[in-house]
């Protein structure tokens, strides 16, 4: 009897010890206003909890001060690992200095956090490849290799938020592919707005993009019966949706719609691809990225090295950040069913 009681006491003590040692993971997402961040947050929370971690998931409404405050609270509450998709990649140094002093490990999620040596690892997609996929699509479908400067294709360019480090890779990858055709006169941007700064959109705002596209249409005289516009480069889907809204309002239809690129395969953009008002999107399966982060968290919690496949690309100003890059995939009207529906990413009813 005494032996049995001792065994029970020992078991209870073990369970209690396990509970007190449960690792707390803080997950800080930038906003709930974009579909992809909801999916990222939900996927991570579900997988981390299934792996036995306590998860504190917070969304910051694209408010830098709010995100900073939420991270401060995570540190106060004893979170020992932070996963952060920063609103502004350069705005978190102060709070992350505190994290480093407390021995908290920091994983930058999809957006690299700049100028902080507290960042331990980075998990993202191959963002340069995202841009090259978009650029290559335009080269192929505008038939730029077959054109001459006497018959150029006309394009306007849009990218994302200037405080998001990823735009250097999205935009840079696309421009690297397109630059030879700009240089030879085979590809022309009538507005002359081709620099990253000129094409950037604060907070990836659909509304701001729509306004800029409307202004370009008015200034350049674009339209089905007006000046020719063959394509609009867009770094992601929230940007593409603003472009599409403006072009539809200007009278374009699926029969004469300029080629509009995108990224994320957001539901509205998939619907636009089906309708012929967006040409393509780069699919980044957030389930894959979330699963990779869970592996990284698990390795950190167990004191081992997490899986890394890039130690050259991402320098945040304090040095190269060891990274894991997931593969982006091309998507359009021809393959969205196998890519998104058959894989279980969406239900068919989501995009009907």
Model-derived features: positions:
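Sec-dependent N-terminal signal peptides of Gram-positive bacterial secreted proteins and lipoproteins
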Residues: 1-17
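A residue-level marker of the well-folded mature domains of exported/periplasmic proteins
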Residues: 17-352
